Amino acid sequence: LRKTVLRSLGSAGITLVVLLLLWQAVVSLTGISSFIAKGPLDVWGFLFMSEDAADNRAQMFPLVGQTLADSALGFVVGMAVAVVLAVAFSLFRAIEAGVMPLVLLLRTIPLVSIAPVIILMTGRGTTASVAVIGTIVVVFPALASVLFGLSRASQQSLDVVHVFGGGRLTSLLKVNMPGALPSIFAAARVSVPGAVTGALLAEW
């Protein structure tokens, strides 16, 4: 186990170094203006080498913390909405027929185009705007994954529940939901980058 952890950390470290080197190479070789794109060396100098480095860190780190908090809020709300919708869709097909087209419609509309409307309705930088935008970003991939997991329940297990008099809700709680846990965790892992993107868009 220790070797596996060390190997994973080593691979992650090497990947990070390679990405930083590629980032710096692209910025340096293409001659992109520093006003448009900063390289890792520019960021390092801004945070640790310049005369105002201490002030820069004091100003930036609280903002990073706020963005992470906003990302967590959008992630939690989006995942919760996705799970609730998936359960409702599994229990009541009429709800799926009525709500799924709206979810697909939100997915096809670029979020950048509707974000200003959401911010006007909920306020710039408010908890509501962060939650709404984060939910829109997170809910579709998470919903698709959770629905897939719920539909993959063992038919034999479902038959056992039905033989003992269990209904759809019992089957959902005792068979479908436990069987969907891997898909829920996979949805959570996939949704994290989307939650960060949603938080940045809501703050912008």
Residues of each region from the PLM?
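Transmembrane alpha-helical segments of polytopic membrane transport and secretion proteins
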Residues: L1-V17
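Alpha-helical membrane-interface segments at transmembrane helix boundaries
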Residues: L6, F61-L73, E96, V103-L106, ...
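Periplasmic/extracellular loop-to-transmembrane helix junction in inner-membrane transport proteins
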Residues: L29-V76
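Transmembrane-helix boundary motif in ABC transporter permease subunits
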Residues: L73-V103
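Generic hydrophobic transmembrane alpha-helix motif, especially the helices
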Residues: L104-P141, F148-G149
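Glycine-rich helix-loop "coupling/hinge" segments at transmembrane-helix boundaries
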Residues: L120-M121, G149-L150, T197-W204
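Transmembrane alpha-helices
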Residues: V132-I136, L169-A202
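Short helix-to-coil transition segments within interhelical loops
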Residues: L150-Q156, V160-A180
